[in-house]
Structures are given as C-alpha cells and as structure tokens.
Amino acid sequence: MKEFPKNYNFIESEKKWQKIWQEKQIYAYDENIAKDETFVVDTPPPTVSGQLHIGHVYSYTQTDFIVRFQRMMGKNIFYPMGFDDNGLPTERLVEKQRQVKAYNMGREEFINICNEVVASEEEKFRSLFNQIALSVDWNLEYQTISPLSRKISQMSFLDLVKKGEVYRNNQPILWDPVDGTALAQADIEDKEKTSFMNYITFKTEANDEFTIATTRPELLPACVAVFYHPDDKRYQHLAGKFAVTPLFNVKVPLLADPLVQQDKGTGLVMCCTFGDQTDITWWKTHNLPLNTIITKKGTIDFPHEIGIDGLKIKEARAKIIDILKEQELFVKQEEITQTVKCAERSGAPLEVLTVPQWFVKTISHKDELLKRANELNWHPKNMKIRLDNWINAISWDWCISRQRYFGVPFPVWYSKRIGEEGKILYADISQLPVDPLKDLPIGYSKYEVEPDLDVMDTWATSSVSPQLSTWGISDEFAVNKDRHGKLFPMDLRPQAHEIIRTWAFYTILKAHLHQNTLPWKNIMVSGWCLAEDRSKMSKSKGNVLVPEKLLEQYGSDVIRYWSANSKLGADTAYSEDVMKNGKRLVNKLWNAAKFVSQHFDKLSDEDKKTNLIDVKEKITHEFDQWIINKLVELVNNATNELQNYEYANAMHLTEKFFWSVFCDNYLEISKTRAYDEENKNPSGQYSSVLTLYHVMQTLLKLFAPFMPHITEELYQILYSENSIHIKGNWINYGNLNYKIDAKQPERLLEILDHVRKFKAEKNLSIKAEVQLLEVSGIELSKELTSDLKNVTSAKEVKFKPTNDEIKVSILT
C-alpha cells in the first residue's frame, strides 16, 4: 500500500488520471475479441454548431456510466466518438462566427472556412469530454464530413437507389426561405402565431358574389380553385360552376371536397399552389394546374400591374389587402391564433415550393417501422410512444437533398448527351467518395454531364452513424466487410428524447432498408438539463451553465455525481445542493479510506491478494458477517440495476449503503475491535480489518462508473497499481452468504439509535460514558453485546427478555 496523502486535490488528481488512462490505453477496443464478448455503442456525434453547455455533460456521462460498468463486467468495449460536422447547423455556426454568407462567396472558399471552424470547435469538445472522463477510445473517432464518412454515406445512397427506395421528383416540398433550402418534415416545428383571417369577395361567372376566408391573401394570384364541403347545404348551388378571382379575374372551378372545414371562415376556401399541405392534396386529387408565385428567397414572382412583384411575403400581403379595400372587395378581418410550420433552425415560416429533390421512401414503410420500434429494447420504456406517435404522423417521404454547400454531395450527374438528356448517372462504388463538381462518371467527359449541386441532409449521414464506425452498409456496400459484420447491429444507442423523431427514426429506417434489421438492440434515452428554476436553458435568458466553470469549482466526479442522480429520461434541473452533496461524498470517501487504511498493515500480504470468497472463513465476527451479507446484497442489486440501465438506482443504493450502513454504523461499531490496542480480541480484530478491507474495495468498485477519479486515486493507494477501470474488474461474490440471524445485528443498530437520540437530547457527546444500558425486549449475543458496549461507551449492559417491543433505559 502506498503512503496516504494528507489531502485530496481533485484538480491535480483528475488531470493526472486522465493523462494516465490515455497513455495506458485503458479504454482501447480490441478488434480480435469475438462479437458476443463485445459491447458496441453508437455514440451520439455532437453537432458542431455552437457553445458547449452542461447539457452535453449531463447526457454523455449517463452513457459512460453504462459503458464503464460493462467494461468492468468483462466486456470488450467499442465506444467511439464522432463529430457531426457537416450540414446546415455547422454552416449557420460558420456564418455567425465569421460574419459571412455562403451565397455571397465561392463554394470552395466557404467549405475551407467551414473546415477551419470545425477543427477548432472539435478540439473544444475533445477537451471537455476528456475532462469529464468519458471512457471513449479516441482511436475510433470519426467526422461525418471525412472522406471515409462521405464514402459510407454515398454507399448508403447508392444501396437505396439499387433497392428502389430512393427517387428524385419535382414535387411540392417544404422550403426555408432564410436558409434557402428544402427541408424534411422532421426539420420543422409548429409555432403558435397571431394572424388574421381575411374575408374577401369573389364572384361567379354569373356575377353572383360570395365570400371566402384566408390567412394568405397574397396568394390570390396563385389561386387555382375554390372549395366547399360536399355536405354544406349553403353552397350546393355552386356545383359545376366557376369563380372569378378578385383583382386578377382568373376563372377557377368551384369544387366540393371533404377536407374543407365547414365551420372555419365562411366554409369556402381558395386552393393556391401552395399555401399548405391541404393545397397539395387538392392539387393532386383534382388534377389542378400549377401556378407558383413565391421564389426560393421568399419573395413574390408575379409581374403584374398590381405591383407586388419582388415584394417580400408580408409586404405583398399588406399591399393586396390595401388594394382589395380600395376596390371594396375586402369584407372584414378577424384576429386569430394559428399554428404555423417553421424551420427548426432558422425559425422562419416555411413555404411550399415545387423544386426537384431526392426522397427516401418512408410513408410506404410506416407499418414495418412501427414493428421495428416494438422489437427495440427501450430505456426507459415510456419513450417508445414518442417514436410511435412520430411514425403515425408522417405524411411526407423523407426529403434528403439540401441546397447548401458543406455536406456530403450526391454521387450523381445528369447527362447532356444527345438522346439521353437529363438521364441520371450514378457513380460506381469504386469511385467513392466522389465530388460531382470535380469528378466525372465513368465513360463521360466534363462537357457531357451536369453535376448535381445539392448536398445530403445532415441526417442522411448521421442516420448511418453505426455504419460510419463499422465501415459498411451491407455485404455488397462495405469498406471492411468483416469489421461491419463484427460490429453491426450494435448493442446500444444513447441519445436525447428530442431527436427520437430524427436521429432514432432515420437510423432505424436506414438499417431496415439496408439490411432488414434494427441498428441496435437497446436505446437509452436521456432527458433535458434544465436551469435551476426548471426553465429551458437559453442564451437569451442568460441561464446557460458553462461546464468549464463548474469543473474548476467542483471537479468532474461531482458533476458526474449530479448527472447520476437524474433518472434516465427525466428532464432534470441543475441543482447546487446536489453538487454540494457530491462534493461531500468525495470528501467522505477520502476520509473513510484514509481511516480504514491505517489498519491494513494488520493483514497478511496473502490475504490482501485473495478474493473475499476465499478468505470468508477468517471473517468470524457476527457483525462483520452481517455487513458482508448486506454488501453482497448491494452488489447484486446494483449490478441488476446497471444491467437494466437504471444507473440512478444503482448510484442511490451504493451511496445509501456507504453513508448509512458503512460510515454511520459499521465504522463506528467496529472501530474498537479494529484498533484492539490491548490485544484482547485478535480474531475479532482480524475479522474487522479484513471486513474493512473488502467492503472499502467493493464500494470503490461500485462507485467507479460514476466517480472515476476519486475511486482510481483511492484504489491505487490502497489496493493495486492496476486501474480500477480495467476490463473484468467488477465484483462477483456468487452465493456468498453467512448463516446468521440478521435480526440480531439489526437490533444492535436499533438500540444504538436509541442511545444516540438520548445523548443528542441531553446535549451529551456521542462518546459520553454510560453507566448502565438496560435493554428489554431482546438479548444480544456476547459478540454483539461487546460491540454495543464499545460503541455506546457503556460500562454495563443488561438485557431483560420480554415479549414487548425494544425499550432502552440509560443511566449516565
């Protein structure tokens, strides 16, 4: 055993161990070990999109608790770290940091700037993840924009093309006019906004007036029909007739359709191409013409004497209303609250434009995906309903093309050869990764092709995050077929609940389409980290907690302790009180270890090296045997909780045992025997010290997944030069159980509790001498009576056997 330092300096200790763990490759994955002996994690690649915050620490450490446990259980661990450094989130960060706009500069120049920013931001993540002691193997690191990742992502695309699960079509899509790109259904959020319902006068061809209601009068030039409900008796006379649009005098059909809400507005609604998804449905169902007037920049494209061409949406709306009023065609306006579909990233209200895009078939697989969700092991189980609800709500195929720069390009060109103009040309797998702006399809010259200028949705690459680590999509599309077969499907996907509809869903979809399987066996879903007042953290509120400051103040182990106190899946508020409890626990571990260590020289070297099971006969005292039984029970329960991903329960059980059973009671009760200064009870002393030795060692191992630095420091001082975190270092006491009457030691604790309360009420020191301790209702064994006398400082203990409850009389 090493000399015990006087104090614990967490800053020095944490830096020291983080360096040693990396140097000794404690967390290295061994590719030569079989799959069934390996625990494979699909680690969330953090999005390189802004400031690091305590939420990163919160969710990533919860995964690490499980990984460290699995490693100590003997599993070979595949625990990579990736960086999701391509796509719109990164582009927005770059534009903000460098005060540039992608569209105002050359594509290559902007990509170079993105690469510079990404490299700097990723280094910050690495530093933080090392500080909080994530036990990842950094040799397995990947970036979603790296050549290998681009190759895997393009393989995924080509495999889906081959399977007929991807198509390109010129159809209505959701468009973000701020970021200038198409979006998928999962990229939008519904926002409640104040708006106005505008009542406008239309006429029939016969000059009969009627009123329609709309929130978007600026779309009048795009009106292609007017609809009413087939059961609405008010408008049956309009069947088969035509309306004439105000201001523009365009003849459009009056049609019946059950999607019309009779009680909304006047029950008459114009169909424009396009205001919303209902317009799309009507356009398709009734084979209506396409009349697009909104540009990709969110302005009006409608040269007309009315003068709205080039105006922004809101400007055009106001002008149309003014002109309608001038011509007495505007009936009234009502303020309403409506749900508006907005871009999740930019916050901009979305438009529906018709632009050629790439799509992954999704709607046709909804039933299959619901079955997949049911096959998956959910932790916690109640998170499954979120995926079920999302799948049931899907109404669009997944649009995977984005009109941006910094992303994975489509391995696609379009032929300009005479006779095959527009033919889609795909890269050969041997060419991947390709950049169609620089590379060419086999057999074509640069004058014969037009490159696809779009890049893939960042989720199109993130959705193959398991495959980015396994280096393969399928047996046919693989960089390393053997590696892919050994690692896929994976064991665990940890992630936050807000991206179930994106990352979880898309990854399940891709694995299902590629290999007809789930991507992992288990999904572990974390909640949000909230501010102390339980509000969502945001820069605007000024309540974002920066990890670096907390690490300086408390250290990594304390922050991890706070994270471990949050149940999986629960949204948890940051708590200064919990942090202080964590700091108190670290100090108590140090002091308890320091106390027990002074007795370890009383043990033989052989017994120190021997497993508890093999020295159990040397633990002879009844109270020592009782705590060993309790310890075995704790190990079994904590192990079971961790195997079920209930790390918070495991932490709670361990902490409660440490404070209540070990520190508050066992240490105090066994202390006199451990010292045995007069050598009155050598077997009792040896039993006590051997018990202290193994209980402390076991507690360090139980705490190790949660608080890796303090446990490593103490373990190496007291027990071994090998890391506490090495593979196979968990506790297994099998069926170890001492045949004792457990009620006897528990009665001892009950009596002790009475004495402590008595002394506290009399303002006596806990060590104050007791002349006579008289106990009725039970009689303790000779060994336990001796312990009771020692711990209560009682000169004499008398027992009065009765059938009554325990009563304690104390004479001081």
From Swiss-Prot:
The reaction(s) this protein catalyses: tRNA(Val) + L-valine + ATP = L-valyl-tRNA(Val) + AMP + diphosphate
Chain span(s) of sequence motif 'HIGH' region: 46-56
Sorted UniProt keywords:
Aminoacyl-tRNA synthetase, ATP-binding, Cytoplasm, Ligase, Nucleotide-binding, Protein biosynthesis
Q: What does UniProt give as GO cellular component?
A: cytosol
Q: Which Gene3D superfamilies match?
A: HUPs, Isoleucyl-tRNA Synthetase, Domain 1
Is-annotated flag, keyword Transferase? no
Pfam families under this entry? Answer: Anticodon_1 (PF08264), tRNA-synt_1 (PF00133)
Localization per Swiss-Prot or TrEMBL: Cytoplasm
Under the heading InterPro entries, the entry gives: aa-tRNA-synth_I_CS, aa-tRNA-synth_Ia, Anticodon_Ia_Val, M/V/L/I-tRNA-synth_anticd-bd, Rossmann-like_a/b/a_fold, tRNAsynth_Ia_anticodon-bd, Val/Leu/Ile-tRNA-synth_edit, Valine-tRNA_ligase_type_2
Transmembrane: is it a keyword of this entry?
Answer: no
Q: Where is this motif: 'KMSKS' region?
A: 536-540
Which residues make up the binding site for ATP? K539
Q: What's the EC number here?
A: 6.1.1.9
Q: What Gene Ontology molecular-function terms does this entry list?
A: aminoacyl-tRNA deacylase activity; ATP binding; valine-tRNA ligase activity
Where primarily located?
Answer: cytoplasm
Subunit text: Monomer.
The role this protein plays is: Catalyzes the attachment of valine to tRNA(Val). As ValRS can inadvertently accommodate and process structurally similar amino acids such as threonine, to avoid such errors, it has a 'posttransfer' editing activity that hydrolyzes mischarged Thr-tRNA(Val) in a tRNA-dependent manner.
Domains: entry comment: ValRS has two distinct active sites: one for aminoacylation and one for editing. The misactivated threonine is translocated from the active site to the editing site.
Q: Which family does it belong to?
A: Belongs to the class-I aminoacyl-tRNA synthetase family. ValS type 2 subfamily.
Q: Which NCBIfam families match?
A: PRK13208.1 (NF009687), valS (TIGR00422)
Instruction: Quote the protein name from its UniProt record.
Output: Valine--tRNA ligase
